[in-house]
Amino acid sequence: MAELPVTELPGDALCSGRFTISTLMGGDEPPPAACDSSQPSHLTHGSTLYMRTFGYNTIDVVPAYEHYANSALPGEPRKVRPTLADLHSFLKQEGSHLHALAFDGRQGRELTDGLVEDETGTNSEKSPGEPVRFGWVKGVMIRCMLNIWGVILYLRLPWITAQAGIVLTWLIILLSVMVTSITGLSISAISTNGKVKSGGTYFLISRSLGPELGGSIGLIFAFANAVGVAMHTVGFAETVRDLLQEYGTPIVDPINDIRIIGVVTVTVLLAISLAGMEWESKAQVLFFLVIMVSFANYLVGTLIPASEDKASKGFYSYHGDIFVQNLVPDWRGIDGSFFGMFSIFFPSATGILAGANISGDLKDPAVAIPKGTLMAIFWTTISYLAISATIGSCVVRDASGDVNDTMTPGPGPCEGLACGYGWNFTECSQQRSCRYGLINYYQTMSMVSAFAPLITAGIFGATLSSALACLVSAAKVFQCLCEDQLYPLIGFFGKGYGKNREPVRGYLLAYAIAVAFIIIAELNTIAPIISNFFLCSYALINFSCFHASITNSPGWRPSFRYYSKWAALFGAVISVVIMFLLTWWAALIAIGVVLFLLLYVIYKKPEVNWGSSVQAGSYNLALSYSVGLNEVEDHIKNYRPQCLVLTGPPNFRPALVDFVSTFTQNLSLMICGHVLIGPGKQRVPELRLIASGHTKWLNKRKIKAFYSDVIAEDLRSGVQILMQASGLGRMKPNILVVGFKRNWQSAHPATVEDYIGVLHDAFDFNYGVCVMRMREGLNVSEALQTHTTPEALIQEEQASTIFQSEQGKKTIDIYWLFDDGGLTLLIPYLLHRKKRWGKCKIRVFVGGQINRMDEERKAIISLLSKFRLGFHEVHVLPDINQKPQAEHTKRFEDMIAPFRLNDGFKDEATVTEMRRDCPWKISDEEINKNRIKSLRQVRLSEILLDYSRDAALIILTLPIGRKGKCPSSLYMAWLETLSQDLRPPVLLIRGNQENVLTFYCQ
């Protein structure tokens, strides 16, 4: 714990207790009312510090709900725990800061306060302006049951029972329920893995799988619900139209009657929605009661003895032989098959997302969604099984409906179960002309019921409740999608109104879509696509649960435990299979739309971070493959140039970053290293902000690289840390890339000594080394500070982006003067594979003797062909060993003159002291020992000017200065001489003298 100094108390504040804890801020806290000797003085009510930290004098705090919530409670400032710096670093006596950390007038709201919601809070006393919130029964179970029940229950389930038989019908029901139950378990797991806000299915998928899949599903799910409003409304309108025609009172004509009734109905539903969720919920309860009454009416009807009219239509109340006959299938018609019946029934098992879609209007979504959804699935399944079994026990498959078809004495045979009940339907049964019976009459439930109009009312309730649920779901899901701004031009519809933040604009948009499809009246074509959109949602919900489980992320901790990742995977696969079983072409369209929207979001790359399981999966894959690389032994064929680039802040040297990323992009590792020089205590607070900003800059520039920074006392020690600690396992840098130090002649000699020391350290650590020089320089920050003219700034901008543009039909000149293992050849080969450098011609220059030029050229060409690099143009330099021109030699001598010791006539003690104080200076002995190397660099600079003045890039072997024998100033003079007069960028490369190229296949 971080201890606070105890301020002295005035004498009159002292009590008789043995221990006394003073207040943190002296007069800022109220003094104790009195000293009570019956308890230690540090337990008095005046010490709020005790309430927080068990009486210890510390700013550390106990666990509290508010420390983990995203926002504060309404009307109260947000509480935060002390930072690590507050606890660990030197404590400053800043009264306001300490008081904010330690003093809490609420006397320690601790972990038990987690019962209070942090944003949509549900306090025990409801405030006047508090939004309406629903429990699991009214908010989820009833809503899901109403959305699951539909016209198929009333008009198609008896027919499916007649076709498939009771046994296979139960199998169809249970298979459908298995899919929805697995999805319900997945929803329950996802919805209990953290606080769920508004947005329903879209929110669950997007926060689990990320914005890419979540955004695409959210958009099509909202659209599917909007069209679902039209589908259910048209179902209601068709029933009303049939009633009008039955009583001879049509409005206009059959098609326009549907349009008129549909538009009027959806307008009424819109008005209910706009009235608020409270009124919408009351309407749903009313519809639920109507359906319950219709069910009771049906069950009572099955118990009433059949009238003559009902008997003529095939109803004879419960009989065992009818039940036995209807156990087995009797396939008829085009759809007469198991999968045909399954495809017709399955949509009636969907609708389980209705409760989750209003997650923002639930009191406790984590409790309401699992309990309400699973209970809705259970009770609707019971209702389907019960209706299938009861109606299959009461009604025969074929009946004429003619009351005159009673049994009469005569020679004609009588076939079928009806014969045993005094009815002869043999003729219509043989001719397949029966109009009634379980397999022929869709209104069988109405016929069986005690009062047929109540079944019609049930159909009305089922269709209207489903339409209302779809209208609310479409608007709520779309509102959340708009707020996340994953797609353009939709933010207008995200605004909420009133205490419940009702999506009024979303309601109006869903209303417009519904009216459009009602007027089009071509729902038979669009309905299969909509069904597949819902199945896409089921598949992705199940996959979300599976993926979150399989990644083993510590953040996946659902409080609902009754799920299985393998069951979720099965649910995802079977949902896709069912899509194709229902309508294969609609499945292809649905998947195509999802992929299109997915690719759009991937292309746009929205700046959101929801901690998705995709991110966790990426980490798992990266970790698994990184560990797996440890088992792979190094091989020349698998060599990759993995670069540690000393960029400092990457945006200071954009050209260097661009150049290296050209040959490492999608190929190998690139780390941008940054050494922050200074005392660690002062620089540590900068690290996190600096790293985040530079990583964003790399991402914005589309550079696939890592950023790594260290704090060190000087550059050299910092780079040593980077070279030893950067990377992971086999993914460690093997090349150090640095920019050329242009100001070496005017800079402090110690910095030059550090710079050359970095190169020596790289060779000691078995790194290859690349030194990059551009005539304009690499550090744009210097240019921004020194240049003031617009022309100069434009030139710097062009130089900083030179490697982002195509290099044209110039040349890449490689001076492969010394064999370093092949790195000098490999890097230009990798560059040439990129589009920007693909048009450049590569020329290879090697040293040689004038009398053996052809032989040496052929030998190098043969070697290059074995390397399969595609380099065919080779030039031998026979004059490389000639003496340089005198003027160039003189310029080199003038360059090193300020750095010479001139120790020829000085005593040994003086020379030793000078060398100790100025190790970068060059003695006369070192001049003489390195004279041949120095002249070689001068001569090579002349050759570079002769051959490569107009090249796009010059690559040559980096000379090596022996440690202790070549002072830093002399080595810098070599590099300066090689590159100072060249217009093209120059890259000096020296590998670690190990092979990186091979012509063997193993």
Curated annotation (Swiss-Prot):
Residues that bind Na(+)? L146, W149, A462, S465, S466
Query: Any idea what this protein is called?
Result: Solute carrier family 12 member 3
Q: Does the keyword Disulfide bond apply?
A: yes
Family, as annotated:
Belongs to the SLC12A transporter family.
Tissue spec: Expressed predominantly in kidney, including in distal tubules (at protein level). Detected at low levels in heart, lung and liver. Not detected in normal aorta, but abundantly expressed in fatty streaks and advanced atherosclerotic lesions. In atherosclerotic lesions, expressed in macrophages, smooth muscle cells and endothelial cells (at protein level).
What subunit structure does UniProt give? Homodimer; adopts a domain-swap conformation at the scissor helices connecting the transmembrane domain and C-terminal domain. Interacts with KLHL3. Interacts with IL18R1; this interaction is increased by IL18 treatment.
Query: Which Gene3D superfamilies does the record cross-reference, listed alphabetically?
Result: Amino acid/polyamine transporter I
Outcome, altering R156Q: Knockin mice display typical Gitelman syndrome features, characterized by hypokalemia, hypomagnesemia and increased fractional excretion of K(+) and Mg(2+) with a normal blood pressure level
Spell out which residues are annotated as carrying Phosphothreonine.
T44, T48, T53, T58, T122
The reaction(s) this protein catalyses = chloride(out) + Na(+)(out) = chloride(in) + Na(+)(in)
Q: Which residue pairs form cystines in this protein? A: C414-C419, C428-C434
Task: Summarize the impact of V996M.
Answer: Does not affect protein processing and glycosylation. Decreases localization at the plasma membrane
